[in-house]
Amino acid sequence: MTLTMEAIYSKDLNAVLQYNANMANPNGNFTGPDSRPRYTSSGARSVDGSVREAMVLSNTKKGGSFSYSAILTKGFTKGFYGQLSYSFNYALDVSGNPGSQAASAWSNLASYRGNNNLLDPSVSQFSIPHRITAVVSKRFEYLNKSMATTISLFYEGSATGRYSHTYSNDMNNDGVTNDLLYIPATRQEAAIFFPNTAAGIADADIFWSYIEQDSYLKKRKGGYAEQYGGLFPWVHNIDMRFLQDFSVRTGNTKHTLQLSVDVLNFTNMLNRNWGNRNRLVYGNGRILRWVSNTGAGVPQFAVNTVSGQKPIKTFETSPTVSSTWGMQVGLRYFF
């Protein structure tokens, strides 16, 4: 049995960063609990109104990562093999470059500062903090080793990605639809952000219930959601492999016909509620849309609908092949 451990620390020295040189500093602020910067008009956000964007490719030293892994391995003993591994990762960056061009990589960043040029390091969209894998395999030989059966199980457990809680439209007039959510500290504070109408009061109740059922938002009450602060739930997945060998020897040559059966997401085959991946009920977690500001400058919102329904939970099962089991059958000949 062997144990292997590894730790890696890295520091960004010249990480890629884009910024819009035509972006002016915000010229106002909202009032109330969410007093983030804003632009009072669309014209106020540009240094030169005749130019839409002036993207500059730059570098930043802000950011870094730490990772740790441990692997415990049990070598082949009487046909048995086993391995257990754990990995931890924490990474910060200013930009993970979430776009195909400089402009989209810049505009796809989420912020509450009112200007995507003014960003601090946040958790990387690629940073999955914990991951566990395991392999167990056993080979059985019989009939004078003319036949053999191998059964293997492969386990993986981890979160499946990160996301940001943002509004579904441009609340601060910066021209970018990626403003991070403010999470009210109390139910009474939440009411400030919705019109004092029957629909507004109902939306405030829905929003507060949504916060209470979301483990991340509950911890951020009275503050802003973080860029890629949301983490998708863990998925526990087991794959199974079955190998059946049929061997004969002619002279000095051994001929083996091997039948293989691979069951992907074997957990889901056992129970349709197991091995399921999750997706956000409303696209990218954008459950609120900005509708107006009060005369005093307090932003007002409405809860978005999903297929005519108001969202009451963060996640739902993703109806894709990744949430279902599959089978592969193969036949190989060795000589």
Where are these regions (language model features)?
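CBM-like carbohydrate-recognition segments
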Residues: 319
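Intrinsically disordered, low-complexity regions of eukaryotic proteins
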Residues: 8, 14, 36, 50, ...
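C-terminal substrate/ligand-recognition segments
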Residues: 77-82, 225-249, 253-259, 263-270, ...
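Gram-negative outer-membrane beta-barrel transporters
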Residues: 4-146, 151-160
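Extracytoplasmic gating/loop element in the C-terminal half of outer-membrane beta-barrel translocons
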Residues: 150-251, 258, 283-316
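Outer-membrane beta-barrel and related beta-rich outer-membrane complex signature
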Residues: 4, 15-25, 94-102, 161-179, ...
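Extended hydrophobic/aromatic segments used for targeting, binding, or gating
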Residues: 23-32, 38, 47-50, 99, ...
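Hydrophobic, lipid-facing positions within transmembrane beta-strands of outer-membrane proteins
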Residues: 1, 66-70, 130-136, 236-242, ...
